[in-house]
């Protein structure tokens, strides 16, 4: 039975981290909301699962994954579940926990990237909080992007198995998620990302290697890969970069 991924159909967002894992593993999955409405797709397909009174463990918000009777929300939790099944969580419990820790750190970085354009309220337009966004983005560019990427550089450099992967010598969902984080930063903050990446050669190498993996490469070239846009987490506003 195919996995069912439920996420907004027009953005990469947090669902993209799950998509990348499924695609890299060659897993059978359905991106439900991207199906035509006549096939049960569209954004309206998300609401019944989220508001299902018969499910005491319904997800708070997309993304969520359905695998038979199991419904899992939160990107990191979905990947914690999928990782061992897809062979993307390293070898053994210790690798699995380390992979999860890396994913949670990536989630922190993603949340901070989002807050650069919505620093006050997610319910207000960017234009209504632009002054605060300029201040938040400056701190993110100057301090937080380098801090996150430098830490991942250290993880790669200190990996006893070499600097090609974050965990051991095998591909994990943390590698794929770091690829997506770097891709997003390069889109939203091209100048700031370039400065930080100039000091993190192992991160740059991992990003390039992931892009060259056949399944990932094919996915990135396919219509299944939604382009970055200004409705997602990583948004390009020139005034926020520098």
Question: Which residues make up each language-model segment?
Answer:
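Acidic/histidine-enriched, glycine/proline-rich intrinsically disordered or flexible terminal extensions
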Residues: 223-242
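GST-like domain detector, emphasizing the conserved glutathione-binding G-site
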Residues: 1-138, 237-241
């Amino acid at each position: 039975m195919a996995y069912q991924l439920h996420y907004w159909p027009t953005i990469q967002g947090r669902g993209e981290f799950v998509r990348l894992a499924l695609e890299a593993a060659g897993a059978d999955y359905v991106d439900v909301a991207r199906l035509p409405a006549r096939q049960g797709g569209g954004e309206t397909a998300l609401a019944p699962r989220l508001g299902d009174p018969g499910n005491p463990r319904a997800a708070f918000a997309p993304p969520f994954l359905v695998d038979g009777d199991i419904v899992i929300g939160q990107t990191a939790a979905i990947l914690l579940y999928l990782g061992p099944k897809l062979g993307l969580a390293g070898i053994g419990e210790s690798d699995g926990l380390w992979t999860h820790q890396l994913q949670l750190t990536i989630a922190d970085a993603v949340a901070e990237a989002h807050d650069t354009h919505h620093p006050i309220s997610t319910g207000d337009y960017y234009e209504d909080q632009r002054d605060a966004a300029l201040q938040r983005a400056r701190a993110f560019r100057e301090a937080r992007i380098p801090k996150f990427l430098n830490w991942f550089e250290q993880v790669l450099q200190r990996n006893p198995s070499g600097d090609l992967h974050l965990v051991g010598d095998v591909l994990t969902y943390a590698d794929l998620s770091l690829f997506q984080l770097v891709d997003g930063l390069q889109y939203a903050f091209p100048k700031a990302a370039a400065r930080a990446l100039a000091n993190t050669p192992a991160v740059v190498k991992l990003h390039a290697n992931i892009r060259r993996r056949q399944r990932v490469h094919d996915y990135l070239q396919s219509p299944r890969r939604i382009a970055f846009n200004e409705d997602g987490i990583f948004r390009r506003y020139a005034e926020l970069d520098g």
